[in-house]
């Protein structure tokens, strides 16, 4: 059970939990954190953010049935997700250069993921979990930390990252996320 505070600022501002993303936002840009989580200013998402969700979904489909998904199916899913109000993309996102660029790269991200997840020395079984919620309660902190692990295997977890460049070293954001998971 979490510690109950008098004049709990989290309760006052409707913050029921932290996530790895929220913690990273606070560390990297406290003003953005205040805008998003205190003042509830919801900025628009974009094609790059939706790309990650799209690749995650199609890789999960691949892992479930070991059948490749066509490039047209991937692009169709991406387009429908960018258009979906849940992802909160700007209404003009489908006309943007960023959207066209991401659309053209989707199949490459998917193929890299399939190659990695199909390597004989790494992957032999279906994941035992997908988008599994974790909750960390600390008696000294008034709200829990909550996150979702993309893929769970018997002896590994995978948090999918899609990026145009392979970083030479892991970022502090990723280290914080790894510490939570």
Residue ranges and their predicted role:
Residues 58-137:
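A non-catalytic, helix-rich entry segment at domain boundaries
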Residues 125-127, 132-181:
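Mg2+/Mn2+-dependent nuclease catalytic core
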Residues 19, 28, 144-148:
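Short, flexible loop/turn motifs enriched in small residues
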Residues 9-15, 30-42, 157, 161-163:
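Short amphipathic alpha-helical segments and their helix-coil junctions
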Residues 1, 60, 142-146:
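Accessory terminal regions of nucleic-acid processing enzymes
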Residues 20-68:
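Nuclease catalytic cores
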Residues 1-27:
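Terminal, charged accessory segments of proteins
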């Amino acid at each position: 059970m979490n510690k109950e505070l008098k004049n709990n600022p989290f309760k006052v501002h409707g913050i029921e939990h932290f996530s790895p993303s929220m913690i990273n936002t606070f560390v990297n840009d406290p003003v953005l954190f205040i805008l998003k989580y205190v003042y509830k200013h919801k900025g628009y998402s974009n094609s790059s953010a939706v790309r990650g969700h799209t690749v995650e979904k199609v890789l999960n489909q691949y892992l479930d049935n070991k059948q490749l998904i066509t490039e047209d199916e991937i692009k169709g899913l991406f387009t429908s997700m960018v258009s979906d109000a849940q992802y909160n993309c700007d209404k003009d996102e489908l006309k943007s250069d960023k959207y066209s660029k991401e659309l053209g790269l989707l199949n490459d991200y998917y193929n890299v993921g399939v190659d990695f997840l199909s390597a004989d020395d790494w992957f032999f079984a279906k994941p035992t979990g997908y988008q599994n919620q974790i909750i960390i309660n600390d008696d000294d902190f008034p709200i829990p930390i909550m996150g979702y692990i993309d893929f769970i295997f018997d002896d590994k977890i995978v948090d999918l990252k899609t990026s145009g460049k392979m970083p030479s070293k892991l970022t502090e954001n990723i280290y914080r996320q790894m510490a939570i998971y």
